[in-house]
Regions:
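Structured aminoacyl-transfer and RNA-binding surfaces used for tRNA recognition/handling
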Residues: 4-169
Length: 169
């Protein structure tokens, strides 16, 4: 029987994610709508979007995802095409993302980002398989904080102090 050595570190990069997933004849971004398509798949934008790979990536250590990121779209025409595939109209794209589309007129270098889950790294270093073991203020499985019993009701004095007017249905 092959048993995993808990003292060994086995990192791997996950790449070539699909750019889109399709549900009920509608496309959705698998990562986010600003993830760049793989350069070798650009020609599929107008014919087979479901076959496009993204320039997204995750880093996994011993089966736990530690972080992820992507190379971002830096070309206005590609971004507009992605919005169109996602069913975002030109008007909606202009309203929500006009600042970005306008910025592309002036040029944008290829760029990307990545975020690590520091708590996940600490969990592995601590030899635990439960992230709650290493989070400073963990919540219970029902999302209750044992430190301050939140979420909880806010009394009338607190509502007044904060300028809140809570209406019930």
């Amino acid at each position: 029987m092959c048993i995993r050595d808990r003292n060994s570190w086995k990192p791997l990069w996950v790449v070539d994610f699909p750019l889109f997933e399709k549900e009920n004849d509608q496309y959705f971004s698998l990562h986010h709508p600003f993830t760049s398509p793989h350069p070798n798949d650009i020609e599929l934008l107008n014919s087979k979007p479901e076959n496009i790979r993204s320039l997204g990536y995750d880093i996994v250590m011993n089966g736990y995802e530690l972080g992820g990121g992507s190379i971002r779209i830096h070309d206005r025409k590609i971004q507009e095409n992605i919005f169109n595939i996602l069913g975002i109209s030109k008007d909606e794209a202009k309203e929500k993302f006009g600042f970005l589309l306008d910025a592309f007129k002036y040029g944008a270098p290829p760029h990307g980002g990545m975020a690590f889950g520091f708590d996940r790294i600490v969990m592995l270093l601590a030899g635990s398989n439960q992230i709650r073991d290493v989070i400073a203020f963990p919540k219970t499985t029902s999302a209750t904080s044992l430190m301050d019993n939140s979420p909880s009701n806010v009394d009338k004095a607190q509502q007044d102090e904060l300028g809140l007017d809570i209406k019930s249905n």
